[in-house]
């Protein structure tokens, strides 16, 4: 049994398989998940698990080079934006419109669905390298 890091076997497998620039998405419970993209559904009820809890665990176990957010988060969920920036201080941040964000999710290796129910609580994490 693992002692630390991501314990969810599906998430751990996806993280282990990522190459440089591959992407994964951590999403609120409302983001549409495109056909053909691996869905890892953690949502058990509204708010559980939270977006920020899942982001923290994944970020602790992943080399992240870049972060993509919907620009709408700036005016519609400033608290989540602030918390993301506090948790992810090293990567480059990119902002795109929500429709473009949803297009980008089609290329993700996986989308991790949380129970989060606040607007635009979604992030695309671009894998970096550990060397």
UniProtKB/Swiss-Prot annotation:
It comes from the Bacteria. Pathway: Carbohydrate metabolism; D-ribose degradation; D-ribose 5-phosphate from beta-D-ribopyranose: step 1/2. Its EC number is 5.4.99.62. It is found in: Cytoplasm. Substrate binds at residues 28, 98, 120-122. Its main location: cytoplasm. One of its GO terms (biological process) is D-ribose catabolic process. Homodecamer. HAMAP family: D_rib_pyranase. This is D-ribose pyranase. It comes from Bacillus cereus (strain ZK / E33L).
């Amino acid at each position: 049994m693992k002692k630390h890091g991501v314990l969810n076997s599906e998430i751990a497998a996806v993280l282990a398989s990522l190459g440089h620039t591959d992407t994964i998405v951590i999403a609120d419970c409302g983001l549409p998940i495109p056909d053909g993209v691996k869905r890892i559904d953690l949502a058990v009820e509204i708010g559980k698990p939270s977006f920020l809890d899942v982001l923290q665990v994944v970020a602790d176990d992943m080399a992240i080079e870049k972060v993509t957010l919907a620009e709408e988060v700036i005016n519609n969920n400033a608290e989540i934006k602030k918390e993301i920036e506090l948790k992810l201080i090293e990567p480059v941040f990119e902002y795109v419109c929500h429709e473009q964000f949803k297009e980008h999710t089609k290329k993700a290796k996986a989308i991790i669905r949380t129970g989060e129910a606040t607007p635009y609580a979604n992030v695309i994490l671009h894998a970096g390298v550990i060397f």
